[in-house]
């Protein structure tokens, strides 16, 4: 029977399945951070259980670390306790930890791929909703809750029901300057923020194949923002070239054997999906969210929509509420909306290609008066590479703040946050009310678009910036 990529990955990991029971899956990789793991380790300790496979468990600190100092005390008592607990737990249970002083420390979904922890064909879990990022490699990756974190630590397995399948095909070639972030925001604009609920999404089409691995990670990272369980891109030569030579990747003949298997991880001809969505890449322009969920998104050259234009009463009410929170009036051009802060970072857009794109706009320009702009690399290696390329100097000379790695202003768990009423052009993944700080107003954009907003003081079309 013809199978989708998701069905192949799921079936390959079933340990046990009985009639009327949820299947038990084997988990190949478990990524751990300081926020969702303390209670899980406490549960192991209370029952006298070890970590079943410490060699398949990798930990880092990211959510509430300071981006200004490596001092564990910098972000308050709760953050300090969580980080100290992670140090203690990893030492006690034999788990590898990339702590604040480790050169590989960084956002968990940046660290995993760049160290070769993430590989095609794997099941990967983490107590974090954006674990879908790793699906870019053709891995089945999804976020889990703290009780499930404990279950995986104890058994290296997890009970999971089968999801529905969705194919999202982006046909044709994207125009110059259109990034993976624009593509995924356009997709969510079409599906809505709940359009993928109950599904695992496979992204395909020429525009997806054209993306680098970093672009594919941005794409899969935001699958969760359309309600999907996970996002997938089938592995190809782009994937294999990225993985080759990385720290935890197979070497020599083992790598060749792995690639032979990875090449089978494609949706079979004739396989059927429960839902199919199609977009034309050439129709996608730079995207900016205007509301309080990622599906409330328009082209940078559009006007703020009028709630009355929505036929669905639920959408209309949501738009009215969003505009009131965002302090926006219907009909005004998006390019006239001024911003207070810019955040370039997060597990969505903090990799080297993202920083290069932002630096290209920042080079030779200055951050607009009254705007605070932060650039937060996703990991120690990203920061080191950016500095080797001189990107930090470009940003600093333009008036951006060059920070240490961490999740930062994406979710405001450290000291990087918006004040009430402040408006931010952000490369992160969520624009919910209060996400970047109580009363803060978040607009999601690509790194180049964020840099353009920083130097102009308002939203601007990067295609017009020469």
Curated annotation (Swiss-Prot):
Q: Does the keyword 4Fe-4S apply?
A: yes
According to its UniProt record, the EC number is 4.2.1.33
Which molecular-function annotations from GO does this UniProt entry contain?
Answer: 3-isopropylmalate dehydratase activity; 4 iron, 4 sulfur cluster binding; metal ion binding
Q: Which residues bind [4Fe-4S] cluster?
A: 347, 407, 410
The annotation note on the cofactor reads: Binds 1 [4Fe-4S] cluster per subunit.
Per the record, a Pfam family?
Aconitase
Matching CDD domains, A to Z?
A: IPMI
Reaction(s) this enzyme catalyzes, per UniProt = (2R,3S)-3-isopropylmalate = (2S)-2-isopropylmalate
- GO biological process per UniProt: L-leucine biosynthetic process
Q: Which family does it belong to?
A: Belongs to the aconitase/IPM isomerase family. LeuC type 1 subfamily.
Q: PANTHER family annotated for this entry?
A: 3-ISOPROPYLMALATE DEHYDRATASE, HOMOACONITASE, MITOCHONDRIAL-RELATED
HAMAP family for this protein: LeuC_type1 (MF_01026)
| General function of this protein | Catalyzes the isomerization between 2-isopropylmalate and 3-isopropylmalate, via the formation of 2-isopropylmaleate.
Quaternary structure (record): Heterodimer of LeuC and LeuD.
Protein name, entry field: 3-isopropylmalate dehydratase large subunit
């Amino acid at each position: 029977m013809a199978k989708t990529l998701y069905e192949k990955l799921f079936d390959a990991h079933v340990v046990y399945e009985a009639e009327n029971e949820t299947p038990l899956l084997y988990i190949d990789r478990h990524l751990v951070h300081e926020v969702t793991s303390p209670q899980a380790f406490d549960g192991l300790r209370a029952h006298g259980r070890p970590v079943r496979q410490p060699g398949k468990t990798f930990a880092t600190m990211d959510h509430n670390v300071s981006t200004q100092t490596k001092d564990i005390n910098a972000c308050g008592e709760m953050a300090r306790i969580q980080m100290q607990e992670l140090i203690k737990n990893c030492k006690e249970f034999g788990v590898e930890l990339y702590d604040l002083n480790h050169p590989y420390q960084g956002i968990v979904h940046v660290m995993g791929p760049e160290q070769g922890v993430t590989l095609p064909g794997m099941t990967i879990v983490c107590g974090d909703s954006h674990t879908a990022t790793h699906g870019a490699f053709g891995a089945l990756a999804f976020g889990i809750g703290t009780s499930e974190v404990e279950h995986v630590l104890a058994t290296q397995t997890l009970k999971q029901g089968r999801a529905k399948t969705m194919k999202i095909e982006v046909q044709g070639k994207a125009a110059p300057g259109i990034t993976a972030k624009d593509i995924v925001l356009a997709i969510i604009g079409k599906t809505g923020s709940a359009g993928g609920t109950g599904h695992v999404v496979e992204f395909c089409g020429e525009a997806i194949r054209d993306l680098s691995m970093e672009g594919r990670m941005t794409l899969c990272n935001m699958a969760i923002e359309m309600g999907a369980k996970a996002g997938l891109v089938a592995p190809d030569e782009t994937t294999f070239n990225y993985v080759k030579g990385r720290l935890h990747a197979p070497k020599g003949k083992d790598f060749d054997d792995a690639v032979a298997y990875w090449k089978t991880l494609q949706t079979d001809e004739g396989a059927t999906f429960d839902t199919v969505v199609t977009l034309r890449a050439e129709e996608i322009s730079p995207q900016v969210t205007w509301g309080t969920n990622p599906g409330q998104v328009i082209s940078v050259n559009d006007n703020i929509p009028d709630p009355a234009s929505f036929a669905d009463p639920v959408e209309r009410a949501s738009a009215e509420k969003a505009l009131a929170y965002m302090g926006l009036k219907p009909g005004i051009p998006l390019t006239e909306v001024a911003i207070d802060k810019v955040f370039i970072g997060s597990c969505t857009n903090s990799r080297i290609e993202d920083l290069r794109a932002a630096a290209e706009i920042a080079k030779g320009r200055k951050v607009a008066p009254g705007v605070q702009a932060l650039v937060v690399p996703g990991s120690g290696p990203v920061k080191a590479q950016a500095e080797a390329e001189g990107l930090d100097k470009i940003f600093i000379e333009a008036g951006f703040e060059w920070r240490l790695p961490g999740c930062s202003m994406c979710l405001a768990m450290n000291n990087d946050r918006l004040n009430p009423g402040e408006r931010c052009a952000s490369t992160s993944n969520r624009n919910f009310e209060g996400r970047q700080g109580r009363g803060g107003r978040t607009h999601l954009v690509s790194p180049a678009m964020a840099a353009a907003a920083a130097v102009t003081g308002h939203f601007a079309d990067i295609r017009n910036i020469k």
